[in-house]
A protein has these predicted regions:
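Assembly/oligomerization scaffold segments
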Residues: 1-109, 204-213
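Short beta-strand-centered aromatic/proline hotspots
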Residues: 80-90, 309-319, 372-384
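Intrinsically disordered, low-complexity, charged/polar segments
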Residues: 395-413
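An acidic/polar, Gly/Ser/Thr-rich interaction patch typically located in mid-to-C-terminal regions
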Residues: 30-60, 209-358
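Short beta-strand-centered interaction patches in the first periplasmic/extracellular domains
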Residues: 2, 90, 97-111, 143-218
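Beta-loop motif signature
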Residues: 343-385
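Amphipathic, non-transmembrane alpha-helical segments in extracytoplasmic/periplasmic proteins
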Residues: 44-47, 104, 117-143, 156-183, ...
């Protein structure tokens, strides 16, 4: 159990020469937030722009400097809870004293501010597509624990990269994969499932300032119509209609079946849309004393007269001056178990498979060198490699892919 009365913070800045300074004693206003629909953590503070032994604070903190926020509970936890590079630098001079206002964003901010054109051929895996974007923008990666669904042909023109990544993860979830998100922690990026936190904090009325619950059908989808590709005249044919809670009225979504997508798969995707967006939306807002270790995507438990259940954190704002935080929560629905008929396919040497794209390695052993390979058809030439880290050996069967080496489980179907 955490003792909130013992929470303490420190703020460390790294200057242009890589020197580090604890500037907490100069900070007047500090907060950080993670918002729904965004990838990056936003940190802001106002500091007294006093003269130090190294000069005025504004001479130490400059645009591009790295700022880290650390918190301790006075016992077992003492860790970095937010970091960012100074993007907005605003020294203010006034008669009552000088101040410095700064806004910082972490490594994922460049994806929120960068547009690109991306083409993913049919069969591209989620992992390959997302890691390709992170590699191109030179964003350090820690781990990938996310989905690796096979996507239909996807063309994204003039789209923000953060939106492309969110769309890929949402599409994978519609195909039955676990809902995941991208998070930067200590300078490295990971793709992880919601609710991956090991410690689940409980919020009760006696340790919380405010609970507010909302129930809404405003954005509810009650019918999905599956259509085929348009003909030369631009007309599309209706191939299936999947109904949900139509008692709330018809709120229709169109799903266009991909060229290489079966009707059964398209209907399954339509059902996933209803499963995800065809429910009454139940959200709750909680204001409580600050628990600085809680992040967006975490699982928490709420006990109040309004609700007693598990929730995912959709957005969170930490305010250090008032030692408080505000969480926007989404009900954590029980995870659906896949049908027993969905058994893992048994692949054998000689099978022709669809490689999702990604990395192929020079050997099956851990630590072997890897190279990027394109999505496409390939033949399994060896299974159960003795090194076990990359157990499958694939060789491409056409010029679409260039895979010729050892690959991981789950990188083909």
């Amino acid at each position: 159990m955490i003792d909130l009365t013992k929470i303490q913070y420190r703020v460390v800045v790294m200057d242009e020469s890589k020197n580090q300074y604890n500037i907490k004693e100069y900070i007047e206003n500090l907060g950080w937030e993670e918002n729904d629909g965004e990838l990056s953590v936003r940190t802001s503070f106002v500091a007294k722009n006093d003269k130090t032994s190294k000069g005025y604070l504004s001479k130490i903190i400059k645009p591009g400097c790295l700022v880290g926020v650390f918190a301790t509970d006075g016992a077992s936890q003492d860790e970095e809870v937010a970091r960012g590079y100074v993007e907005t630098w605003n020294p203010v001079e006034k008669s009552g004293g000088h101040t410095l206002k700064c806004t910082c964003y972490d490594e994922l901010y460049k994806l929120q501010k960068s547009q690109d054109n991306r083409y993913f051929p049919s069969g591209t895996g989620t992992k390959s597509a997302i890691e390709g974007i992170l590699d191109d923008w030179e964003i350090p990666q820690e781990s990938y624990q996310g989905p690796n669904a096979s996507h239909g042909k996807t063309v994204e023109n003039n789209k923000y990269l953060s939106d492309i990544i969110i769309n890929l993860l949402d599409d994978a979830a519609k195909k039955g994969e676990e809902q995941c998100f991208v998070q930067a922690r200590k300078g490295k990026t990971s793709v992880i499932p919601r609710g991956s936190n090991k410690t689940v904090y409980v919020f009760r009325m006696d340790n919380t300032q405010m609970f507010s619950q909302s129930i809404s059908t405003a954005d509810m989808i009650t019918r999905v119509k599956v259509v085929g590709k348009a003909d030369d005249d631009g007309r599309t044919s209706v191939e299936a209609t999947v109904n949900g809670e139509t008692k709330y009225g018809i709120r229709q979504r169109i799903y266009t079946r991909g060229k290489d997508e079966s009707l059964a798969d398209a209907k399954s995707a339509a059902q996933e849309i209803l499963d995800d967006e065809g429910k009454i939306k139940k959200e709750i807002k909680v204001q409580s004393p600050d628990v600085p270790f809680v992040r967006k995507g975490d699982l928490v438990y709420v006990m109040s007269e309004l609700a007693q259940s598990y929730y995912y954190v959709k957005g969170i704002q930490h305010t250090v001056d008032t030692y408080s935080m505000t969480m926007d929560l989404e009900l954590a629905e029980p995870k659906k178990e896949k049908a027993s008929s969905e058994k893992k396919k048994d692949y054998n040497v000689g099978d022709i498979v669809n490689f999702h794209g990604g990395t192929h390695y020079v050997s099956s052993y851990p630590g072997s060198k890897g190279y990027k390979a394109r999505v496409g058809k390939a033949k399994i030439t060896i299974k159960n490699g003795s090194g076990k880290a990359h157990p499958w050996h694939l060789i491409h069967t056409d010029s679409g892919s260039n895979v010729y080496g050892w690959v991981d489980d789950g990188t083909f179907d």
